[in-house]
Amino acid sequence: KTAATAAAAGAVAPYVVTGFPAVHAADPVTLRIAGTGVNAFNELAQKAKEDLGFNIQYITLTSDDVVKRAVTQPNSFDMLDSEYWMLAKIVPSGNLLGMDAKKIKAYDKIVPIFTKGTLPNGKAMSRQGTAPIKVAYLEEQKSKKFAAEPSQWMTVLPTVYNADTLGIRPDLSKRPITTWADLLSSEFKGKSAILNIPSIGIMDAAMVCEAMGEVKYGDKGNMTKEEIDKTIAVLTQAKKDGQFRAFWKEFNESVNLMASGEVVIQSMWSPAVTAVRQRGVPCVYQPLKEGYRAWASGLGLPSHLSGKQLDAAYEFINWYLSGWA
């Protein structure tokens, strides 16, 4: 899921780095970071090497494969770039090491969405879906359970967050798009697309079904069997009716579908909208009256990490929050 344009979760005063490059040059360290590639920037790796003296190696995977790798091959990476929805699948494996909040220099400056479950103005955040605060902390450093209240042990250090909506081709839609329900409007039969990453796409589907008045959810992130059945029934019928041009799973698929005009309205991520515009094609990330589907990601530590690798991971995390990234 992508957000090169997402806001940094902890922009703080510059982090002064002294002496580290020389130390690590004598005893080379490489941190292998597994993730979707959303935050895998070569410029970031180069700057980290200049400032910290060790190598960053990205392992780019699909969202589903990030979860599979974290659960089945935790020794194959040194840091995990995980989206928050993935944590409910990963933490029960015991493969995630609680991150010591006391070692995070800018901990007190992290946006309270992640540390208190509130907006900066103190207003409580929605608890629907995978609200970050519900999966932000572990009971202990080595635990398979989330803490009910903030603890010393963080699951991941939040790095980026954003809110997704529908992308549209305003030159082809022929009318204003105002609601999630428009994704299944008969006007766009054969010209709509939805995200085919189940844990995310089902939330887009829920936004659509509720906007249509087909389903009223108690909690979209913890649906009842009846709610699931109703949601799937709506999608199945739409597919039978030929509503969907495609079900996309990868960033570039969504860009190509929209840029080519094969799709007029679809689930989309903000950098994909930018990529379409860069081709000279009009594309709008459309605000909708029901609101957005929010998401976030962060850096976590696999349970096997220790010694200089663990020390380097904390150095990188503190550097990441220092402002340059």
Regions found by a protein language model. Give the residues of each.
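Extracytoplasmic/periplasmic substrate-binding proteins
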Residues: Q243-L305
